[in-house]
Amino acid sequence: MLASDQELEEAGNRLGERLLRAVRTIATAESCTGGWVAKVLTDRAGSSGYVLGGLVTYSNEAKQGLLGVSRKSLDEHGAVSEPVVREMVAGALAATGADIAVAISGVAGPGGGSEDKPVGTVWFAWGSSPASTVAVVKHFEGNRDQVRRQSVLFALQGVKGFVDEL
């Protein structure tokens, strides 16, 4: 499934509208999507009313230095893992003061996959505190662009569902 530009725009607009109605702010912590979620959210005029910031933490060093992800989590579980995306959410919340954060770390390809984490494996987390954080793993098919597009769409939809439950 290829998430089109229009689908991404519509999902970003729906989340933006929901954040405005809920009077909530958001921050992003992205690895394999390279800031694409933040880009989609800020494409909309008025997004400064709900987007506080975005951090692209592609390397493990950036995850540690900017988000406070522990070396232990990275060593024991790898960057593409539930503990790491949970720590990325906590770090983004702490760094920005946002009400909600979303984190993404995955293997977009074409290389970099392993038996345990093949290309297309992407971990997501979103939440407003460590206790409320939800983590989900998805396995997407397609080339690098398709994996990243599907990841952005899934993240936008997942966060909207989270906000709807608040």
Predicted segment positions?
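Short alpha-helical segments enriched in small residues
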Residues: 1-166
